[in-house]
């Protein structure tokens, strides 16, 4: 690595629409192992940008989307197309079946060795996804002390069906006020996880999080967040849902149900799959299911924006000019290519 990259990342909110310094000034740590993180809300265009960047840098992509790890769930998770995956090697896609437990700890255990292998090969890993928790544990470690229990989780899911998610969120606010205030009332997975930890351990998840000491950053990271104007993003989300339906999303869910993937499985409770399964069970019309997917996807995108706004290390860029951004990365970060890691 050359000495021009030794400055510490300094990204203030006012600088998020562009670089306050050169790209070569991204954060250096004790361990000089560069990683590019590409985040953004669902539908913004992360995959296309990451493929273009990986080709320009002669690198490979590491998935950081919590749903793309599952086999047989392709359309609803918007996995990279066969053409994109043939253009650039992708890692951590299709690695577990829908009935296999998989969480942030499992992701960390899988991702770190892949990144190490790419570094050994002289390549800069490009980690891509919108799952903020996966990106966070990759760079900061994980709160491993918070215990969970599958039986408690199943009981909570049953309560959700009878009482509704708002009632569970209100309970969370009672038993864990700090976390209940931070978690959005529609953030189903985090509500269930927090209540699971509380009912199993007798202590709120915020207690376990306070016990965790974040590790020193193991990588030198360039954190890129792609965004678009809200009306543009929402239009892209609506178009994506329409495209999913045209590609056979309903049949994909029907096949998963035929394979024995019931509503109790975490992947089947996710956005899109939950609504299609409810339609197939006769609980809502197809139009109702599609409209709910559109609405909930827009809400999910809004939560993603809120999550990443809280991390000042991400540099925000309009996804409409990804070609220019790739060219700038290549021009201003010479240590990220030309086999400089060898």
Curated annotation (Swiss-Prot):
Keywords: ATP-binding, Magnesium, Nucleotide-binding, Transferase, tRNA processing. Its EC number is 2.5.1.75. Residues 1-13 have a biased composition (Polar residues). The gene is miaA. ATP binds at residues 40-47. It catalyses: adenosine(37) in tRNA + dimethylallyl diphosphate = N(6)-dimethylallyladenosine(37) in tRNA + diphosphate. HAMAP family: IPP_trans. Residues 1-21 are annotated as: Disordered. It comes from the Bacteria. One of its GO terms (molecular function) is ATP binding. Monomer. This is tRNA dimethylallyltransferase.
């Amino acid at each position: 690595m050359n000495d021009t990259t030794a400055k510490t990342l300094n990204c203030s909110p006012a600088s998020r629409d562009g670089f306050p310094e050169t790209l070569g000034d991204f954060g250096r740590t004790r361990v000089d192992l560069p990683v590019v993180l590409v985040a953004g809300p669902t539908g913004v265009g992360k995959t296309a940008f990451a493929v273009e960047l990986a080709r320009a840098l002669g690198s490979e992509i590491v998935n950081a989307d919590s749903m793309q790890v599952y086999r047989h769930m392709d359309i609803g998770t918007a996995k990279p197309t066969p053409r994109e995956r043939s253009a650039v090697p992708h890692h951590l896609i299709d690695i577990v079946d829908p009935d296999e437990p998989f969480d942030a700890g499992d992701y960390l255990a899988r991702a770190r060795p892949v990144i190490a292998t790419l570094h050994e090969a002289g390549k800069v890993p490009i980690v891509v996804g919108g799952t903020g928790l996966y990106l966070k544990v990759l760079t900061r470690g994980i709160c491993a002390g918070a215990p969970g229990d599958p039986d408690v989780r199943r009981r909570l899911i049953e309560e959700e069906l009878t009482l509704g998610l708002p009632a569970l969120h209100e309970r969370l606010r009672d038993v864990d006020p700090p976390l209940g205030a931070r978690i959005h009332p529609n953030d189903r997975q985090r509500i269930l996880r927090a209540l699971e930890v509380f009912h199993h351990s007798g202590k709120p998840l915020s207690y376990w999080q306070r016990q965790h000491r974040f590790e020193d950053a193991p990588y030198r990271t360039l954190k890129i967040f792609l965004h678009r104007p809200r009306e543009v993003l929402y239009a892209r989300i609506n178009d994506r849902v329409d495209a999913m339906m045209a590609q056979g999303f309903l049949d994909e869910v029907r096949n998963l149900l035929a394979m024995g993937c019931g509503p109790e499985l975490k992947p089947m409770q996710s956005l899109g799959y939950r609504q299609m399964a409810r339609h197939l069970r006769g609980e809502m019309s197809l139009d109702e299911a599609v409209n709910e997917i559109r609405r909930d996807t827009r809400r999910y995108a809004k939560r993603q924006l809120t999550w990443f706004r809280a991390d000042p290390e991400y540099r925000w860029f309009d996804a409409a000019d990804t070609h220019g951004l790739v060219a700038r990365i290549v021009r201003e970060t010479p240590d990220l290519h030309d086999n400089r890691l060898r």
